[in-house]
A protein has these predicted regions:
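A C-terminal functional module that forms or caps the active site or interfaces directly
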Residues: 167, 175-178, 182-194, 199-200
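Short, acidic/small-residue loops that bind anionic groups at enzyme active sites
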Residues: 75-96, 192-210
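A short, Lys/Arg-enriched amphipathic alpha-helix followed by its capping loop at the start of a domain
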Residues: 7-20
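Glycine-rich, highly charged phosphate/nucleotide-binding loops
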Residues: 36-52, 154-164
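Active-site rim beta-loop-alpha module in soluble metabolic enzymes
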Residues: 117-180
Length: 255
């Protein structure tokens, strides 16, 4: 039986083998990671979310962000496999040769993919980061007509710009495209159907890797004695701000 938590993207759950239950464990720190300051805050939020997922019985955890918030801390704290979408996506993209990153966010947020490329030694293999948004989108993220909802439903105002960026990257010699945000997961198949080179959905790559690692691991739970302290830290700021960023740890469990 496959059970999909409504908060987990259906395109991911539907493609996984039967017998897998996906659940979402959102970061309780609601700050949108527009700068390295909020990114550091999300590392703590994701650590706490991962601890909760592991304690609830998850067999693996996926960081639902290419920023891979708190990945080192999560791996140190959890006894279960932890996979970052950024790490998994880059690995898959690099396997095809020279690649480009297409992101729905403005240039001011390129510190996220740039840091990821440095960490994994792939700066030279990446032909470039293509941004399809202007800075003003950061002022209109929330709401029914907000930017995130337009991304999630692959609105033409976003999708057409993404596809144009993909075509520019191909003209520059890209042999694969990595989507620069897991929020683009819902449009990944549509993009792939309209282009001639592989389109890497980092969230899907991470989910596949997590399932494989969980099947080969018997470990469960956590391995840190700091879980309560982490929760007290998050409790102090939880609910203080809600900037409509659905960042979370997606956990895999097995029936």
């Amino acid at each position: 039986m496959r059970t999909i938590n409504p908060a987990v993207r259906p395109e991911i759950g539907a493609a996984l083998p039967s017998g897998i239950e996906l659940s979402a464990w959102p970061s309780r720190i609601g700050a949108f990671p527009a700068t390295p300051v909020e990114m550091a805050m999300q590392a703590i939020g994701h650590l706490e979310a991962g601890l909760s997922a592991a304690e609830a019985g998850a067999h693996a955890a996926v960081i639902d962000s290419v920023a891979d918030y708190g990945i080192d801390a999560l791996r140190a704290a959890l006894a279960i496999p932890v996979v970052g979408s950024g790490e998994a996506g880059l690995t898959a993209a690099a396997g095809h040769g020279r690649f480009a990153i297409i992101t729905v966010w403005p240039k001011s947020m390129n510190f996220v993919p740039e840091q990821l490329l440095r960490q994994h030694g792939l700066e030279a293999q990446c032909l470039g980061i293509h941004n399809v948004a202007e800075e003003g989108v950061l002022d209109a993220i929330a709401g029914p007509d907000g930017y995130l909802n337009r991304i999630n439903r692959a609105d033409r105002s976003v999708f057409d710009k993404v596809l144009a960026a993909v075509n520019r990257a191909i003209e520059e010699g890209a042999q694969a495209i990595m989507l620069g945000c897991t929020c683009m997961s819902g449009m990944a198949a549509k993009i792939a159907a309209n282009t001639s080179i592989p389109v890497i959905n980092p969230l899907w790559e991470a989910a596949k890797m997590a399932v494989a690692l969980a099947h080969s691991s018997d470990s469960t739970g956590i391995k840190t004695d700091r879980a309560d302290l982490v929760r007290r830290m998050v409790n102090a700021v939880a609910g203080e701000v809600d900037e409509n960023c659905p960042v979370c740890v997606a956990a895999d469990e097995f029936d």
